[in-house]
């Protein structure tokens, strides 16, 4: 009777390792597809994955083929057209250099793009890869938690670069000893019997021959046990581990004045939802302060920030003054990493824009690690943008970007929060 032992460790997910390798190999194409898909779905929809499309041309495997030119010697079966040492003319074309010309297909046949589904975790990992809070520094109180990759023992699945040779050979030795223990014991007994039989009188040649055949058969069976098996392989394992880091607070300032139409407000909300997902995905215990403003500013909770219908005129400085008050009351700059993200359509009372410049330059920017401003408009820039441009030229911790339509949101977000390298 034959016995089949299922040693697959992935269960139903038999191709988990191949899937991870595929995601790594085509990461740039997948990220491009995600950046296009994010504008077609609700950003708050994180409970599901995403269907990703990759052009077939991008996943074609490299292949070797005969090039044009050169001399080749081949042996062909005989026929009535050629005799020995005849030279055959080279056929025209070939070598993959066709003209590519031809008539269009009437039935529309062709190769579709390769489409596959990624999970929620894979979607968020790719969405926020290589992003980080800028200028984050350790302070006295360490309440915020950041996730980093750490060694976590060994795993039976992985990529060749992470293979542990020593651990794999240890497993190989243990498996071979376990699988051949009974046969080696029997072999030792047969060898002892053969040695004793050699000294007996009279000689028992037939019995000696039988023992030698049994010993040879056992040695063949032991030798057939493979030296290394996929079951023996062990790879260095890495896992995301929470690490204490500096505590931080993010101020979200959103303009909800009458000049902000519904489409502009929706784009601002999408930006802030991306920011919220980024913070909650990559950091723990980050305080988020929501401030809505028109002629007056008010600190609100998350629900009111995203869904309140209140509107009015526009005085941007009211939000900046309120932010300063909150910082003074609750967030000591010596103990907190303070960040701010402001979204507006740029429309502001003309006399208020210089005041915004003054508040930022003298009070807020010296206290914050990073201040980002996004202006959502298709019109030409007004006084607020021009005042902020002078701040950008003066302060390294101030950044500003322009969003014209929905397709700009994700690229602008990545530009504002991309992970800084040593050279920056």
UniProtKB/Swiss-Prot annotation:
> Where along the chain is composition biased (Gly residues)?
92-101
Q: Where is this region: Disordered?
A: 53-111
Pfam families the UniProt entry points to: DUF444
Q: Where is the composition biased (Basic and acidic residues)?
A: 77-90
Q: Which family does the entry's similarity section mention? A: Belongs to the UPF0229 family.
Q: Which HAMAP family match?
A: UPF0229
Protein's recorded name: UPF0229 protein ECA2349
Q: Which organism is it from?
A: Pectobacterium atrosepticum (strain SCRI 1043 / ATCC BAA-672)
């Amino acid at each position: 009777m034959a016995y089949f032992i299922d040693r697959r460790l992935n269960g139903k997910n038999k191709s988990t390792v191949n899937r991870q390798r595929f995601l790594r190999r085509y990461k740039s194409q997948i990220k491009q597809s995600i950046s296009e898909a994010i504008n077609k779905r609700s950003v708050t929809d994180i409970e599901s994955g995403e269907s990703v499309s990759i052009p077939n041309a991008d996943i074609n495997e490299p292949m070797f083929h005969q090039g044009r030119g050169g001399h080749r010697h081949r042996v062909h079966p005989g026929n009535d057209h050629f005799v020995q040492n005849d030279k055959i003319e080279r056929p025209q074309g070939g070598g993959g250099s066709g003209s590519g010309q031809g008539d269009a297909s009437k039935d529309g046949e062709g190769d579709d793009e390769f489409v596959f589904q990624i999970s929620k975790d894979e979607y968020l990992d790719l969405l926020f890869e290589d992003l980080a809070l800028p200028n984050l520094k350790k302070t006295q109180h360490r309440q915020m938690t950041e996730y980093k990759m750490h060694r976590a023992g060994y795993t039976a699945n992985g990529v060749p670069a992470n293979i542990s040779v020593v651990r794999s050979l240890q497993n190989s030795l243990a498996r071979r000893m376990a699988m051949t223990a009974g046969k080696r014991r029997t072999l030792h007994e047969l060898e002892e019997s053969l040695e004793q039989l050699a000294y007996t009188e009279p000689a028992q040649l037939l019995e000696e021959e039988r023992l030698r055949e049994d010993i040879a058969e056992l040695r063949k069976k032991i030798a057939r046990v493979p030296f290394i098996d996929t079951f023996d392989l062990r790879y260095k394992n890495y896992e995301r581990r929470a690490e204490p880091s500096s505590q931080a607070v993010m101020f979200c300032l959103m303009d909800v004045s009458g000049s902000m139409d519904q489409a502009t407000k929706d784009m601002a909300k999408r930006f802030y939802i991306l920011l919220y997902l980024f913070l909650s995905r990559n950091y723990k215990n980050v305080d988020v302060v929501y401030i809505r403003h028109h002629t007056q500013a008010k600190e609100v909770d998350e629900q009111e920030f995203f869904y309140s219908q209140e509107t009015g005129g526009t005085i941007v400085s009211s939000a900046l003054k309120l932010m300063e008050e909150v910082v003074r009351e609750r967030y000591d700059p010596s103990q907190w990493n303070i960040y701010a993200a402001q979204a507006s359509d740029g429309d502001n009372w003309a006399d208020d824009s210089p005041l915004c410049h003054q508040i930022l330059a003298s009070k807020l920017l010296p206290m914050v690690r990073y201040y980002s401003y996004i202006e959502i408009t298709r019109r030409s820039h007004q006084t607020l943008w021009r005042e902020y441009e002078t701040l950008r030229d003066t302060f390294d911790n101030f950044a500003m970007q322009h969003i014209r339509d929905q397709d700009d949101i994700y690229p602008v977000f990545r530009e504002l929060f991309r992970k800084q390298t040593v050279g920056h």
